[in-house]
Amino acid sequence: MQSLYSIAVLAAAASASLADMDLEFFGTEPAGDYYGSDLPDINVDDFYEKTFDNLVDHYNMQDDRTYKQRYWINDEYFNKGDKKGPIFIYICGEYRCSVPATRLYPFMLGATYGARLLVLEHRFYGDSQPFDDWSLENLAYLSSQQALSDLAYFLGAMKKEHDSEVLVIGGSYPGAMSAWFRERYPHIAIGSWSSSGVVQPIVDFWQFDE
């Protein structure tokens, strides 16, 4: 298998941004032509929606509560043989997630590597709701730290099925998450595709309005 390190380097240099994704954006032009390469389109019908029992609180060993976290999986291109394909996972951010557009470039690239393609919805968004209500007490569990641990717990389960190398992908806030994940969990992810990752967020960013 070709090394995923080369993909991580390519991702860092990629000019196309996945930030603030409209998941249909990349369906407007054939990305294979845009990038000057002959890459396969991804059929959205090959993605299957599932749920995963993730932990509500990853930092309290006495709390065994779980919630249904939504994800999508596409094994159409996955090489399960001796040369196992990698796992390419797109991290959804602060929005209701849906199946990616057919021409999402990282997934098109993943298909050429025989990758399992995954999409994970962020806790507290879409159908991935740990609680029935958004009380202040419950919203205490809405944090990047818990979301990163969600991703680690989820990928741990996926790697038990197939111990594949993992590339995490995201843009804007999920781009930051992909970079943070690679830094925090280098034993899980071999690389990170961070497009416009907000890795140094500022709470009171008053310069933005100037």
Show which residues each predicted segment covers.
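Conserved alpha/beta-hydrolase
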Residues: 112-129
